[in-house]
């Protein structure tokens, strides 16, 4: 057992030694990579920074940070003008220039030596070396260094805000040239030159390799005529984080504090300036941009609903429409909106006038849905002038006069046939050329026995009963009857 314990201990020690060697080799590799390729570390840091959603920290980090830097600059300028500036002569004058004890000429005369010794014993000679002025000298140097850092940071934020956030858009379908300095016209052959912009964004070592090896023609080419052009829009789109940081740490406040005598009353002007700038840019201009985005989204949605979806629904109606009727009735698409008073407005698009027309508020003029029309297609509806037509079949506005005349002719034919039947006469389909339609025939609405009795009492009673039955029960008549 003792030998096994020793073996296990030796095995465990070897594992620990191996882990230490691996950790040391890993650290050596990291230091070697850092020394040989420091730009790779810069790329890694930039990737980590770009992956952070800075807009989420616009209100919680950017605005408090900018206000803190502005207040810090104000306090430093206040101390400089009220604490350092009155003692500027005492802090910057050399004390050795008035040290009479170092003069060999004065030492030759006794009375002058006594005068110089009296100056040395006074407090004015040693005032430059007191702890108070030593502290002021240190604060003066610290204030200068801090102001230099704050000015550099403000200059960087301002340049980043004004010149660092641009995106380029290639507009190939734009035909009209607008009056904008950010919109430029280019040839299609210029697209191959954009390949160099990607090289400039790479590391320094990649750029050197590219330019020392020679330019390779790896960029995209467009085989187009020289006359063909496209527009390029360079749009300025700063992020919310940099906007809030620029507003709270504005260069106008920094310039005002740098070139003016700062006092406690200057704080009122700084607070008023910060509030006005934040109100104009973030609460008015930035929200106006968001409102324009809402309006453009609403206009695009309205165009999609009224134009694109209407065309899609029209094509689907053409595909699903049955061809049994022979012609297709055009049902315009109804769009429902609301007025400012909350009243419902129904509009239909007139393709001839190219505008929307408001429909009357009567419910009879509004066509029903397709499901309602299919459900009630087999029924018969009665209108006010005792006309009958199938429910769900709506005529086109252009064809409505034609069908109205047809229905009127059918009603006249029906009324004339009813009058003749009341007089004792009967009409056979082959004997009358101006007979009514099959669906409106009076013989279709009466049973066979009643028609037979009515026929027997007419002027055609000279025919025998078999001939009458054969005429009434003819195959053609039966076939037409089932076609209904």
Curated annotation (Swiss-Prot):
Identify the coding gene: NUR1
**Major localization listed first in the record, in broad terms:** nucleus
Name under which the protein is recorded: Nuclear rim protein 1
Family according to the record: Belongs to the NUR1 family.
Describe its function: Member of a perinuclear network that controls recombination at multiple loci to maintain genome stability. Required for rDNA repeat stability.
Q: Where in the cell is it found?
A: Nucleus membrane
Residues crossing the lipid bilayer are 145-165, 237-257
For whether the record's keyword set contains Nucleus, the answer is yes
Q: Please give the subunit comment from the record.
A: Interacts with CSM1.
Keyword tags: Membrane, Nucleus, Phosphoprotein, Transmembrane, Transmembrane helix
Question: Per its UniProt record, what InterPro entries does this chain match?
Answer: Nur1/Mug154
Q: Where are the residues of the annotated region Disordered?
A: 416-457
Q: Name one GO cellular component term.
A: nuclear membrane
Per the record, the domain of life is Eukaryota
Biased-composition ranges, Polar residues, are 430-440
Report the residues modified as Phosphoserine.
Answer: 3, 417, 474
| Membrane topology designation | Multi-pass membrane protein
A single GO BP? regulation of exit from mitosis
